[in-house]
Amino acid sequence: MSAKETINSIHLLSDVKFLPWIKRTFALQGWSSYYIVLNHKEKKVCKDLGDDTMEVSSDSFGESIIIEKLRSYDIAFHYLLNNTKAEIINKSGADLIHCWCFYGAEIYQQTNLFRNTIYGPQTRKMFWTLPEKRFRYEFRQWYYFFWKREPSPISSLRRSISKIYAILWYVEEEMEMISQKIKLPPWKFFQFFSFDDIIPAGTGNTDIRSKKILIGNSATIENNHADVLPLLTAISDKEYSFSLPLTYGQFSRYKSQIKSKYKRKLGERVTFLEGHLSLEEYYSFLRKHPTAVFLHYRQQGLGNILYLLYTGTKVYLSQHNVVYRWLKKNGIEVFIFEVDFLRDVQEQQLTLDQKMIQHNQEKIRDLLDHQRNDITIAELEAEVYVRKNRKVNDIA
């Protein structure tokens, strides 16, 4: 069989905003790719979005369409392995290569195995007033079992793992951490975005003269806002102000409590971003903050972090976050909130100097080099040809 035979790939994703990134990533010589965007809001949807893209509902109607379509492809990529995609894997034929393009939410939001490791002490205390979060995993299992009469998402995911050829992600440390709790498919390095996707052409620099401090990236409880607050109150310089993006987040009661806590302690020095901005407007908002704190204990908000580091913001992460160790391993200057923040407040060192900014820019360019995918692509191509040859030999 010729090594130049076209590889037919199909991509299943739930968020159309990532589609341009994925299409650019798979504009590969010798590959033909098709893309399916899952519609989780409507029923019985099947419509073309272009020559190589279609939108399909995530109900049984759409599931049957996708499973039938998979028969024509060599390899399938599943972006964020939710319940629908896991069930499609479980019901698909044995010859198809399945790759799980990891996001994070499909693990952290579907199981309580990490509950004791991703929340700070002050945030954990809030669970007593947030039953919708404290018992979220139990509620979801009951909902799927009693109401939908379907396996819970984590059950579907676990069953699909044996049929997945590889999990694709670029933070190996995170894969090692999760593997201690859940058996994962073999890991291979891959990133479905490039430098230009994260850092658009013409990106400006952070306003180093500003005294705005960014806290977190959303209204999700994994931001550990309550654990950041005590250290912010130690900043006596009233010229400093604090911005909390709270646009995204599932639990309105948590958001309300965080706003109340911050207002009570910081008064008019704190503002909350709750409205939706265009991407350009959001980037402009980020660049107003020469200091940023992301106290997640797990990978989250990585696009924000990389963008801010490149534009010149001094970023503080939790010492518990695998992203901190990953960035340091790759030579990027990032700081520990629990250790460095108060010292830097006292020494008035909450911003980066120009030399360190340039250093981070160079390292992030290296980190986001798309050519790092080449080894994994070659391995996937080899596996496709092995299976094609096996199928030909079986027929013969």
Ranges and model annotations:
Residues 135-187:
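A short, active-site helix/loop in glycosyltransferases that binds the activated sugar's phosphate group
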Residues 11, 66-85, 97-103:
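Short N-terminal targeting/anchoring amphipathic segment
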Residues 75-76, 92-138:
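Active-site proximal beta-strand in glycosyltransferases
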Residues 284-297:
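Acidic donor-binding loop of glycosyltransferase active sites
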Residues 344-396:
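A charged, aromatic-enriched C-terminal amphipathic alpha-helix characteristic of glycosyltransferases
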Residues 203-223, 242-243, 365:
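Conserved donor-binding/catalytic core segment of Leloir-type glycosyltransferases
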Residues 257-276:
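Nucleotide-activated donor-binding/catalytic signature segment of Leloir-type glycosyltransferases, i.e.
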Residues 17-20, 220-234:
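A conserved mid-protein helix/loop that constitutes part of the nucleotide-sugar donor-binding site
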